[in-house]
Amino acid sequence: MVALLGAGAISLVFTLFLTPLFIKLFHRLQWGQFIRDDGPQSHHTKRGTATMGGIVIILASVIGYFAGHLLTWDGIRFDPVTPSGLLVVFMMVGLGFVGFLDDYLKTRKQQSLGLGGWQKIAGQVIVATVFAVLAITLRDPVSGLTPASTAISLFRDLPLDFMALGAVIGTGLFIVWICLIVASASNGVNVADGLDGLAAGASIFSIGSYVIIGFWQFNQSCDSVSSYQNEYRCYEVASPLDLAIIAASIVGALIGFLWWNTSPAQIFMGDTGSLGLGGALAALAILSRTELLLVFIGGLFVIVAGSVVLQRAYFKITKGKRIFLMSPLHHHFELKGWAEVTVVVRFWIIAGLLVAAGVGTFYLEWITQ
């Protein structure tokens, strides 16, 4: 508990008080946001706002995570970091680096296109593939479990194990499955990062849910004396408490960052932040074995990304007609006359309700066993 609270508090203090220094640094480096001409006209005033704030979020999250563990020092030892926690860090940093390359090219060229679409996907696939291999290779030093399972999961593992098809085919399909989850989550957060504070606030709800889920799984783990030793009620998850700790560190970093990112934003997270956060969200879902629950927990990102897919598909099928005034969905409501802050707060409410539904069904599954 000390590590969990400490990680969140340290990362929050880091972003809350040090973000202004990074804003000045980014302006000096000329890392300013480029605004597309075909976007909402009201966004043109944001041109030049410091971007790549994801660097601050990721740095604070990593520092908070390790510092939280150091706080458990009792004069002899401290609670060590685990493969599960380090894998979340790896995913966040890895996809954050892909986003950084995209952001850097945008600021250098002063155009909306940094990395090409397929280049960005390739980066996500490389990071996700390494993550997938490590997640079924490494072992938790206490429980002996691998951080991830090769089975598809909802509230826990379902009887749908890729390895039932054989080691080679099963491993290949598992890697494809992980790449699909990672690409969907990271691009979902990326698409939602279009209004001041929208992605940061929604991510607080989504990633914050894994503080609750991880802590609950820790208390009800199959090797815990507090569990009923019932295979249908306990959770076989490697290091769930450490997943809660890294989730708390990310949430703390986001809360402090949101202070400066709320409208009118003084800094944007950029693709560095949105891809990194989406990667962390995917990693938390995979390692806590709640992958399909992401439909609820990341529900807002599903809706926003879905609006883009729907708009493009309808445009092609009807040869030029549109469902929305503009996609992603938040821009549609802006063009309908909603104030930016109104759109953001209402989307936060939707995100919160969907997360509550996800966590609620997670708990409901346990009490009905």
Swiss-Prot record:
Keywords: Cell cycle, Cell division, Cell membrane, Cell shape, Cell wall biogenesis/degradation, Magnesium, Membrane, Metal-binding, Peptidoglycan synthesis, Transferase, Transmembrane, Transmembrane helix
Catalytic activity: UDP-N-acetyl-alpha-D-muramoyl-L-alanyl-gamma-D-glutamyl-meso-2,6-diaminopimeloyl-D-alanyl-D-alanine + di-trans,octa-cis-undecaprenyl phosphate = di-trans,octa-cis-undecaprenyl diphospho-N-acetyl-alpha-D-muramoyl-L-alanyl-D-glutamyl-meso-2,6-diaminopimeloyl-D-alanyl-D-alanine + UMP
MF term (GO), any: UDP-N-acetylmuramoyl-L-alanyl-D-glutamyl-meso-2,6-diaminopimelyl-D-alanyl-D-alanine:undecaprenyl-phosphate transferase activity
Keyword Disulfide bond among record annotations: no
Topology in the lipid bilayer: Multi-pass membrane protein
InterPro entries per the UniProt record, alphabetical: Glycosyl_transferase_4, PNAcMuramoyl-5peptid_Trfase, PNAcMuramoyl-5peptid_Trfase_CS
Pfam families listed in its UniProt record: Glycos_transf_4 (PF00953)
EC number: 2.7.8.13
Record field: transmembrane: 3-23, 53-73, 81-101, 118-138, 162-182, 198-218, 240-260, 267-287, 290-310, 347-367
Enzyme class: transferase
Places the protein is found: Cell membrane
Cofactor (UniProt): Mg(2+)
The keyword Transferase appears for this protein: yes
A Gene Ontology biological process term: regulation of cell shape
CDD domains: GT_MraY
Assigned protein family: Belongs to the glycosyltransferase 4 family. MraY subfamily.
Function: Catalyzes the initial step of the lipid cycle reactions in the biosynthesis of the cell wall peptidoglycan: transfers peptidoglycan precursor phospho-MurNAc-pentapeptide from UDP-MurNAc-pentapeptide onto the lipid carrier undecaprenyl phosphate, yielding undecaprenyl-pyrophosphoryl-MurNAc-pentapeptide, known as lipid I.
Name this polypeptide is given: Phospho-N-acetylmuramoyl-pentapeptide-transferase
Record organism: Clavibacter sepedonicus (Clavibacter michiganensis subsp. sepedonicus)
Organism lineage: Bacteria, Bacillati, Actinomycetota, Actinomycetes, Micrococcales
